[in-house]
Amino acid sequence: MSQSKYRQL
């Protein structure tokens, strides 16, 4: 779940 947030960075 959290990984999806970092993938946009």
Swiss-Prot record:
GO function term, MF aspect, one: urocanate hydratase activity
| Reaction equation(s) it catalyzes | 4-imidazolone-5-propanoate = trans-urocanate + H2O
Keyword terms: Cytoplasm, Histidine metabolism, Lyase, NAD
Asked if the record carries the keyword GTP-binding, the reply is: no
Gene Ontology terms: cellular component: cytoplasm
Record-listed E.C. numbers? 4.2.1.49
Q: Does the keyword Cytoplasm apply?
A: yes
- UniProt pathway: Amino-acid degradation; L-histidine degradation into L-glutamate; N-formimidoyl-L-glutamate from L-histidine: step 2/3
The record's remark on the cofactor is: Binds 1 NAD(+) per subunit.
**Family as reported in the entry's similarity comment:** Belongs to the urocanase family.
Q: What is this protein called?
A: Urocanate hydratase
